[in-house]
Amino acid sequence: MKKFFLISLSIFAVFSITFAVLITRDGQLVTPVGTGTVTLNAGTFEAFPLPQYAAKHLTEGYKSYFVEVEPGIKVHVLEVGTGFPVFMQHGNPTSGFLYRKIAKELPKDRLRLIMPTMVGLGFSSKVPASQHTVANHMRWINGVLTQLKLTELVYSGQDWGGPVGMGALALSPDLIKGAVLLNTGFGAPTRDINLSIPHAVVKNPLLGELLLEGLFPIFDGMHRLQGDPDQFPADVADLYGRPV
């Protein structure tokens, strides 16, 4: 009986330790790899040929490339047009592809539309959970603007693209000449706030993956959050969800 108890206790201890490691794990850096180069006025960057399921959503003339802002931290950038730079920052949980329909309607002979994807989303690098801070994302996006050697721009941002994009520009305040703010704010909260219960639950690495990647895939349900479900068909959900 004592032997059975000790074996059971050992199994329980191993299970508990394993569960604790899983539920608190931080994750690891995943760095994407491109092919070839893209040459801009600012220099030469690593090209990233888009897979067909993503490329089919874009019109002609797009450039797709990485800007390595820190060792292993690559930001995927979509760019189209020539002229005055317009920096367009998406929010969570989408990517630079969010602005593809707006870009289609803008005069690309007069505007250079620059659409970076935040680290952790789309084709950009994936980082440990602990590195997802507003300060880090501000610095990384500012690194993109710096390496592109922009001297002035108009900014457009929505959702978390507001605090991140405006925060990035706060690090280089001379860049901004105008702003178009959508559903967003100027900065991150300056005081502690309580997360909603759903946000608090999915913040946990294991539970978040189980819920949002297994039981209730977030991108599969995005159409229900839109005013017009037809604007978010299965191939668009795939566009945002597959790289993540």
Residue positions per predicted region:
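N-terminal Sec-pathway targeting helices
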Residues: 1-13
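Sequence-pattern detector for short linear motifs
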Residues: 5-6, 28, 103-104
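Conserved HGGG/HGGXW glycine-rich cap/lid loop of the alpha/beta-hydrolase fold
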Residues: 73, 78-123
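Flexible "cap/lid" subdomain of the alpha/beta-hydrolase fold that forms the substrate-access gate
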Residues: 16-64, 71, 75, 85-87, ...
